Amino acid sequence: MKNTYYITTPIYYVNDVPHIGHAYTSVASDVIARFIRLCGFDVMFLTGTDEHGQKVEKAAINKNIDPQKFTDHTSESFRHLMNVMNISNDDFIRTTESRHKEAVAIFWQKLLDNGTIYEGFYEGWYAVRDEAFFDESELTSDGLAPTGAPVEWVKEPSYFFNLSKWQDKLLEFYEANPDFIRPISRRNEVISFVKSGLKDLSVSRTTFNWGIKVPNNEKHVIYVWLDALASYISALGYPDKQSNYGKFWPADLHVVGKDILRFHAVYWPAFLMAAEIPLPKTIMAHGWWTNEGQKISKSLGNTIDPIKLIDEFGVDQVRYFLMREVTFGADGNFARSNLVTRINSELSNKIGNLLQRTTAFVYKNNDGKVPLLMQGIIDKIYELPILKTASKFAEQNILLMEKTEINKVLENIINLSEEANIYIDSEAPWNLKKTDPEKMSEVLYTLLEVLRYIAIMLQPFIPSSANKMLDQLGVNKEERLFKHLIRDYALRAGSSILEPAIIFPRFEGDVV
């Protein structure tokens, strides 16, 4: 059985500072990476920055700085975002690194040697903002790219990749691998695009300089998307099969925004087929965010700075909201009031309140120790409906994550916490101390065990807070994987818990 897993974010374009979309993609990828690690897999999680191209060159010129200095600064802002958002990436690739440039040159030469690249002359529409070529038929009635980006007519010598040759092979691959593109709506869009006819793709430019030079013809720079996509293999050490490339490729999951799906689901597999490299297993395209129902744009002044959000609300609170608020793959709306509601109603009232009530009662009434139980009682507890629900959700969540139904995993966890809050109210352990102390011990143990399940399942989403919960419950650091969510690793009777501390404070600031 394969015990490795390779997941990537897109490498982010450095023409501007990070925004909420970058944060969302990074957190979603991080949640999946952490989840897979907790399943016992050896995970490689890659993120990084895409630093070449005409758009970056223009941005640097506009600021009157050298492109390398410009990209150094902007790339660092993305690295800072990863640190602040507690992203657990194993590597951070920059396309200006020598390891990447060397791999791209080898990749280009392989395509050339295989007869899939040829010289010609390009004449057509190009959107600098998208770093993409568009056919006349794809332009809007206003003469813009489908994304709304302005286009310009480009005429220049160019190398071409024979994309048209791969049309049928791509369609055959999509048919044979229905999970290659998710969600299904995006898969259908890609298939429709490919069926409409693929034209050979210009893969070099001569009208600007900021990029990787074409080997043996330095008048040309390699098309930024061929350059960028190759980062997924260059970061692993391509073409050395004794490196991580041999260990982790093909990728298990590329997480991308829907706006760059064509590059990943059409161009990338075609390049790989042409270079005789195995294709990634799945490309997951998520939606866009709006701000209070409005499209986010600089001109409207409604961009969302994820760093400021974290400063105000806390990193785990923002991570939780991003993953809970929207079905992964669909568009989402950022509303401050919804963020506050998620924090106060779910994290604080449901999970935090359950943790606080239970641990405070145990600490005060049971000397801060997991209750001692009569022989066989733990087996009996595991037959209770609430523990059966916990076990069921633990199994369900693995299946849900395999389908990248991230918010449904959180929904299960919240439902379990709601059931536990109902349980504590109905059993009222505070009334049992004098009348039935053995029953009180059973109730408290049950609640602590449910909290163990909740905390272990929350680790991918809110790692810092979840681990504080596990510390508070006295769970060994070596027993926090998903395989430990069984009766054999139940809390040890008589073990100590930490003095209760508030992990999920309510947000008392402005709601709007």
Curated annotation (Swiss-Prot):
Renumbered ranges of motif 'HIGH' region: 12-22
Name of the protein: Methionine--tRNA ligase
Keyword Cytoplasm annotated: yes
Cell location: Cytoplasm
Reactions mediated catalytically: tRNA(Met) + L-methionine + ATP = L-methionyl-tRNA(Met) + AMP + diphosphate
Binding site residues for ATP: 298
Molecular function as annotated in GO: ATP binding; methionine-tRNA ligase activity
Family that this chain belongs to: Belongs to the class-I aminoacyl-tRNA synthetase family. MetG type 2B subfamily.
One Gene Ontology cellular component: cytoplasm
EC code(s) of this entry: 6.1.1.10
Highest rank taxon of the organism: Bacteria
Stated role: Is required not only for elongation of protein synthesis but also for the initiation of all mRNA translation through initiator tRNA(fMet) aminoacylation.
Chain span(s) of sequence motif 'KMSKS' region: 295-299
Disulfide bonds: none
InterPro entries referenced in this protein's UniProt entry, alphabetically: Anticodon_Met, Met-tRNA_synth, Met-tRNA_synth_2, Methionyl/Leucyl_tRNA_Synth, MetRS_core, Rossmann-like_a/b/a_fold, tRNAsynth_Ia_anticodon-bd
Keywords: Aminoacyl-tRNA synthetase, ATP-binding, Cytoplasm, Ligase, Nucleotide-binding, Protein biosynthesis
Main localisation: cytoplasm
Gene Ontology BP term (one): methionyl-tRNA aminoacylation
Complex formation: Monomer.
